[in-house]
């Protein structure tokens, strides 16, 4: 029986220069694997707690030495000797060991790092790729990437209110071709922005961060880039938004679009989106309303839920209980999946299974603070999520996930690229 021999953690750096945890697990056959935990910029208030040191003399208070120490002492002590391939049992032990609903004691960053490293070590010991270990024989589907090519909001220091303007390459036969087309659109967009004397510096997730007069102009220039690159807008490459509305809302559920000097209530903001959807081939809107604006979400879902994908990120924070509430209230029709919002691989799996059971789409997602770790690429294929958000075709921490997906596609001798079939379920 494979058991856990050792567990340890190290403070390393993420893509924004902030500290994060690298956890390592060694098994009884001396197999070793590590995992690096990501971190978000715009975070939902109900996310599992990321433990920081708050020592202002180190990393402006963002150090993670306490979380590392929790791995190196408490977690290590309780996990040594446990069966390695029983992921659910080990993850449940981690949850019980913490004793809070949001990992406030040990830190979700400490717990997730160990959970990820354990899955990777077990797969390695069994000589299986991670996607096959987690997903079994049914892990065959390459996800449609949602590439963030213009950044705004908290991901960029510019005048755009919406956090992400994305492209989705739906009309292709393979992941490789879809990614190639996306990269060509990205480079074409850069030339267009250069021609408009716009900034082509990039945001946290590799997208450009130009200044525009309103929130419509990015849709226009992206549409131009798609067509100039030689692709059919809406047919081969569609558009998607992450509004990150929780960053725009006040206590009265009024939404402040500072770039346009507008203040809109929930119904007015939904009407604003409907104009966008009528004019542009937008197939997905994420966090269109605040995480606390459940009434507004119900209206948004009623108005647009049959036309496009409505993704809950801050709304659900990868939490099965919150997702169940959304299901019961007919709110949204898709969920963003971020393992560090919930704490362990097993809890993430539970949420994905619940979503799939109720025909909610799942979008595997990175965070704005990432690393070279490509775990989510395998995870997306393992669970056949059908979609993945992992940034633009720039910045190596984003490219690491795309390169891993290319590798998986090759191993699967093509696999199945879901493409246009993604939105034909209903």
From Swiss-Prot:
SMART domains per the UniProt record, alphabetical: Enolase_C, Enolase_N
Catalytic center residues: 205, 338
Cellular component aspect of the GO annotation: cell surface; extracellular region; phosphopyruvate hydratase complex
Gene3D superfamilies in the cross-refs: Enolase-like C-terminal domain (3.20.20.120), Enolase-like, N-terminal domain (3.30.390.10)
Domain of life: Bacteria
A biological process from GO: glycolytic process
A Pfam family this chain is assigned to: Enolase_C
Its job: Catalyzes the reversible conversion of 2-phosphoglycerate (2-PG) into phosphoenolpyruvate (PEP). It is essential for the degradation of carbohydrates via glycolysis.
Name recorded for this polypeptide: Enolase
Species name: Helicobacter pylori (strain Shi470)
């Amino acid at each position: 029986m494979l058991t856990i021999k050792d567990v340890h953690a190290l403070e390393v750096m993420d893509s924004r220069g902030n500290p994060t945890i690298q956890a390592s697990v060694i098994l009884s056959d001396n197999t070793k694997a590590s995992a690096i935990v990501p971190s978000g910029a715009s975070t939902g208030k109900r996310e599992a707690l990321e433990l920081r040191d708050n020592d202002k003399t180190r990393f402006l208070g963002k150090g993670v030495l306490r979380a590392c120490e929790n791995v190196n002492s408490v977690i290590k002590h309780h996990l040594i000797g446990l069966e390695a391939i029983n992921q659910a049992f080990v993850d449940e032990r981690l949850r019980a060991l913490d004793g809070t609903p949001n990992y406030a004691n040990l830190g979700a960053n400490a717990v997730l790092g160990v959970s990820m490293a354990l899955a990777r070590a077990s797969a390695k010991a069994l000589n299986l790729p991670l996607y096959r270990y987690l997903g079994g024989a049914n892990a065959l589907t390459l996800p449609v990437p949602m590439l963030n090519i213009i950044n705004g909001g908290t991901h960029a220091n510019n005048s755009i209110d919406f956090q992400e303007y994305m492209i989705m390459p739906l009309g292709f036969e393979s992941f490789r071709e879809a990614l190639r087309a996306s990269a060509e659109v990205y480079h074409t967009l850069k030339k267009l922005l250069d021609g408009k004397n716009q900034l082509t510096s990039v945001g946290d997730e590799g997208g450009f961060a130009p200044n525009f007069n309103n929130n419509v102009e990015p849709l226009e220039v992206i549409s131009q880039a798609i067509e100039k690159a030689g692709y059919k807008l809406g047919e081969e490459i569609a558009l998607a938004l992450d509004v990150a509305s929780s960053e725009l809302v006040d206590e009265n559920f009024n939404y402040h679009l500072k770039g346009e000097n507008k203040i809109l209530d929930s119904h007015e903001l939904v009407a604003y989106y409907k104009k966008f959807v009528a004019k542009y081939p937008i197939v997905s809107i994420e966090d269109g309303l605040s995480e606390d604006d459940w009434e507004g979400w119900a209206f948004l879902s009623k108005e647009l839920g049959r036309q496009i994908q409505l993704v809950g990120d801050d709304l659900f924070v990868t939490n099965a209980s919150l997702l169940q509430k959304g299901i019961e209230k007919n709110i949204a029709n898709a969920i963003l999946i971020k393992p560090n919002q919930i704490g362990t691989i097993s809890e993430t799996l539970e949420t994905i299974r619940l979503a799939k059971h109720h025909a909610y789409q799942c979008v595997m997602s990175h965070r704005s603070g990432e690393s070279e770790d490509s775990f989510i690429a395998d995870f997306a294929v393992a669970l056949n999520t059908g979609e993945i958000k992992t940034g633009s075709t720039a910045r190596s921490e984003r490219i690491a996930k795309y390169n891993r997906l290319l590798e998986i596609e090759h191993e699967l001798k093509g696999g199945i690229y879901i493409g246009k079939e993604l939105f034909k379920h209903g």
